[in-house]
Amino acid sequence: MAHSPGPIPRGDLVPSGIVGLLGTQGPTARTAIARTLGLSPATVTQVTKDLIARGLIEELESVPSNGGRPARLLGLVQDAGVALGAKVTADHVAIVTVELDGTVRSSVSHDYDPGADDALPRLGRILAQEVAALDDRLLGVGVGVPGSVDSQASGIVDAPTLSWQAAPVGPSLRAAIGSPVLVDNDVNTLAAAERLYGIGRAHSSYLVVTIGRGIGCGIVVDGGIYRGANGGAGEIGHIPVWHDEQDQLPCTCGSTGCLEAHVGAAGLCRTARDRGVIGPRGTLPTLLRAAATGDEAARQVFAAAGAMLGRALAGVIHTIDPEVVVLMGEGVDGWQYWQTGFEPSFRRSLLPARKAVPVVVEPWTEDQWARGAASLVLASPFDSAGTGGEQSRLVRVRLGAP
């Protein structure tokens, strides 16, 4: 059964909700808009009439209807607006321009040092430069970071890998670029993108698990991202997995024995070096190439990591009870080597009633992190729960403005 992005109960959400729906689902008849968003046909007729007059949407071809006269489809006009998405890492910022239908129009990367004294002003200048270069109407900017965020609307960030503690990312960027800015954990941004354009259109409760430099998890329950009391839900990379003193590998969070310390990119390389599979300067691509050429020792490194990930993820399944799990991230390029350890470990660790939970592995491109960040903006029309606060409201104002 397909799920809509959600009912639109408040009047200020209706115009932008309709525009957003046409962006995520493409040309749609008025009756389908009413049904999907939980609106009356009269409301849809009146609001779409106004949106057509403003030049935001247009009538397209007619399609057959059930027993009545043909229904006219509605679609977006070309310049309805775009969102900017930025993914912040330890050495660069990836930025994309994304249309309402999720299409990435352009992408660029800037070198970046988050530990520098002027890190936030520098990030503001980078984004202001990209905003100034846009020819399209900007709806807002979404920012994804590898850490905890107090709320999308505020954007105060704790990210040890960026050397940020209570960093006022949201306020600083809003002052620098003069546009709505929403900030969230980078894996949560991928979950937001899945809600709009991917598996979330067919499922209302799911996990988005990322493997790569780190291990993360975006949790979606009843169509909404679960953030926890302080914005730190889903940090499964910091589940303790050690059994004895030798297992307590140091983690970037400052603790030891975390899942990420063992199966993140650095942990895989450490294990491979200790076993002599790769040299002292060997990297994850080196290990992956060895596995691809048939090196059984290299494949065993991935399989052991997969088994550890499977056991940890089974515990998350028992806690959240999702309909489906989506695996993505840089690490999925070598998933066939992870899977030999993951699948038996994962299934064996699940309760009988949960053993059939599907695990979907999605192909990965580098643009997906930043596209996910842009999805924070593009999800604003459906933000009936108020997750994005005033920033989402400002996006809706821009989306519904003539």
Curated annotation (Swiss-Prot):
InterPro entries: ATPase_NBD, ROK, ROK_cs, WH-like_DNA-bd_sf, WH_DNA-bd_sf. Gene3D superfamilies: 3.30.420.40, Winged helix-like DNA-binding domain superfamily/Winged helix DNA-binding domain. GO terms for molecular function: DNA binding. Pfam families: ROK (PF00480). Residues 30-49 bind DNA. Keywords: Carbohydrate metabolism, DNA-binding, Repressor, Transcription, Transcription regulation. PANTHER family: BIFUNCTIONAL UDP-N-ACETYLGLUCOSAMINE 2-EPIMERASE_N-ACETYLMANNOSAMINE KINASE (PTHR18964:SF149), ROK (REPRESSOR, ORF, KINASE) FAMILY (PTHR18964). Transcriptional repressor of cyclobis-(1-6)-alpha-nigerosyl (CNN) degrading enzymes. Belongs to the ROK (NagC/XylR) family. This is Cyclobis-(1-6)-alpha-nigerosyl repressor. It comes from Kribbella flavida (strain DSM 17836 / JCM 10339 / NBRC 14399). The lineage of its organism: Bacteria, Bacillati, Actinomycetota, Actinomycetes, Propionibacteriales.
